[in-house]
Amino acid sequence: MKTTILILLILGLGINAKSLEERKSEEEKVFHLLGKIIHHVGNFVYGFSHVFGDDQQDNGKFYGHYAEDNGKHWYDTGDQ
């Protein structure tokens, strides 16, 4: 009787341990997916801010060129 109870207890603990491992792997998958989503949202916000010129306002810079320059560059507003 004691042996049967002991065997059932050991089997039960094994099943619980397996289900804990399965839950852990599912949680890791969810956290990995959330991390990817957050990363992509951050990239989108970063690109969006550059497209619409938030850097120009935030850093006090303008996008333009001097007469002697061939291309356009970022300049400090103090250089005008």
From Swiss-Prot:
Q: Which residues form a coiled coil?
A: none
Q: Does the keyword Nucleus apply?
A: no
Organism field: Styela clava (Sea squirt)
The protein depicted here goes by the name Clavanin-C
Query: Which positions bear Phenylalanine amide?
Result: F52
Q: Does the keyword Secreted apply?
A: yes
| Described function | Has antimicrobial activity against E.coli, L.monocytogenes and C.albicans.
Instruction: Please give the Pfam families that the UniProt record associates with this protein.
Output: Clavanin (PF05452)
Give tissue specificity per the record: Hemocytes and pharyngeal tissues.
Which stretches of the sequence are propeptide? Answer: 20-29, 54-80
Indicate where this protein resides in the cell.
Secreted
Q: Which N-terminal residues, if any, form the signal peptide? A: 1-19
